[in-house]
Amino acid sequence: MKKLVLFLLFMTMTTFATAQNFRFDEMTYSPEKTTFKLFAPADAKSVKVRIYKEGLGGKALKTIKMQYVDGLWTATVKGDLLGRFYTFDMGHGECPGVFAKAVGVNGKRAAIIAMTQTNPEEWENDQRPICKSPADLVVYEMHHRDFSIAREDAQYKGKFLALTESWAIDHLKTLGVNAIHILPSYDYGSVDETRIDSDLYYEHAYESLPEGVIPARADFSPQYNWGYDPVNYNVPEGSYSTDPYEPATRILEFKQMVQALHKAGIRVILDVVYNHTYDIEHSNFQRTYPDYYYRKTADGAYSNGSGCGNETASEKPMMRQFMLESVKYWMDEYHIDGFRFDLMGCHDIETMNQIRQMVDGIDPSVFIYGEGWSAGQCAYPSEQLGLKANIPQMLGIAAFSDEIRDALRGPFSDDTKPGWLGGVNEEESLKFGIVGAIRHPQVKMKKVNYAEKPWAVEPTQMMSYVSCHDDMCLVDRLMASVIDKSNHNSQFSTLNSQLKEELIRLDLLAQTAVFTSQGVPFMLSGEELLRDKKGVHNSFESPDSINHLDWTNKEKYPQVFEYYKNLIDLRKHHPAFRLGNADLVRKHLEFLQAPKGVVAFHLKNYAGRDDWRNIIVILNASKQSQQVNIPNGNYIAVCRDGVINEKGLCTLEGNQAEVSAQSALIIHD
């Protein structure tokens, strides 16, 4: 019995080792033949590949039995299969494999195309915008539909191509952001791509019906989802393309988007969701190698650390290799400049470090960050997971700071509870965020809201933010917790002018804290337009009427956009705000004594070789103006009373500075 167990263990390890000598090249095309390879159990009764004419519907043109050779199931089909579609079938339902690079509508079948024909003109000359340090990044998180669906002059509303249009590029460049974090843009399962465009539906339905049968016309309601429902990880989402039926279209248009942003000096960061799949039964992982890619609990149930019904097992050799190859593929094929790992706390540390190491070998400037938490208990030791507390073991990888987020606006658990902006004593938590979650002698860790000890080795390992797609946007949160707590159904547009002015003051103050902190600044798209979602806490499948950006706000509240723009410029022009090194932060950043509700700090002695010798930032959340003692000197104010001007607004002399209620003061000498 012992010999049998050892033999089976040896065979299993040999299978994985042999399979790992291959990349996930499940389909290799040439005009003479096409070769298929699949990682699937050696003891599978039957593994087949089916060839189809269409991406959806119709019977298979060919069905070929695959043979098990050297740890993989393989088959070769002679002849030119360009333009055909294929699926794998091992008795659990057909699927396009786990590493399809092109698919038909809804991702049910993989497509055989020539990838070189999906490159836009001059693609070979496309280059990543220069980024010397993650501290130099200004990350702008956006959803394709949110950004462009309500823009009157947009030609490609809700599509990849919207980000190639001049209005979009001009807005982003003027604002000053230099990295776009796009919400999931791989092929996901929660939007039916056949019901996006009634004309396309009619055209393709007509082609698939018997001669003489005319399909009924159909009008489709708009569909919306954030896309955290992975199906095909390595193919762009079809609903963001102009034709989801044509496999090459989504690929070409995604590349055109990247190319346009790169020409504008803007990096592209992909939101990747390797921690779970849309479901288990229908997933490509499960249909090719049942239960291998998922974690299970001690009692045999599927673990649910993602909160979505399952969690993948990144520590298993082939899941780890899948993640490594997928990241590399997006970098090589689509020129992606960074990756945001959804629920990074579900992934093991070793896999994350191997990804960082691999990426460094290609381009060390590619930025990696993620959520340093999970959404439930993972079936893996917490000390080995990519949690925020373990960031010191993952150098070169950053995590979101819920400390600074919740210090500013209030706890995630209750939208009606305020934070520092609403008068709560969270000064130490805010200080912890300002230094970038590193060890600093003036931060009293016992008073920090969540972290028991510093979790970042370098400040560039902390994402500084006050809002993102999750939870309420900043305007809604301020409405619910500070401005109009007594009437939770009211909306920003219904406020009187006095309350609107107060909300705007707090909004600008919050972002000043974010953009003058030493972490990597991150903002939700539309915050520069006073975006609101009508109070919706979780808008993942809410309609466009909730999620769209209201572009008319740019004209209604020009002072808000101007402040955001000038705040970003201030950070970009002055290295003191982005030192990028923990020792430099401890050397040059000193907190000043300040009254309750105020946080003040001094960036001293030409920090980061800044042109300004001393910079003092005073953040006042209280409803009264406050006095703060400062080093005696002659100062120029560049931020005061909701206005920023680097050339100077006024001068101050002496050893005291007065900052207006609910505002920031930035001065220098």
Q: What would you call each of these model-derived segments?
A:
Residues 20-35, 67-158:
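The feature marks proteins involved in alpha-glucan
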Residues 30-37, 42-45, 588-629:
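Carbohydrate-binding surface patches
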Residues 38, 43-56, 60, 625-642:
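Beta-strand-rich binding/interaction modules
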Residues 38, 142, 182, 261, ...:
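Conserved, mostly hydrophobic/aromatic
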Residues 40, 82-86, 650-669:
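C-terminal beta-strand-rich structural cap/linker in extracellular carbohydrate-active enzymes
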Residues 113-114, 356-357, 361-525, 529-530, ...:
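Conserved alpha/beta catalytic core and glycan-binding cleft of carbohydrate-active enzymes
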Residues 145-166, 170-178, 183-334, 347-362, ...:
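Substrate-binding/active-site clefts of carbohydrate-active enzymes
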Residues 446, 507, 516-536, 548, ...:
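Glycan-recognition and catalytic regions of carbohydrate-active enzymes
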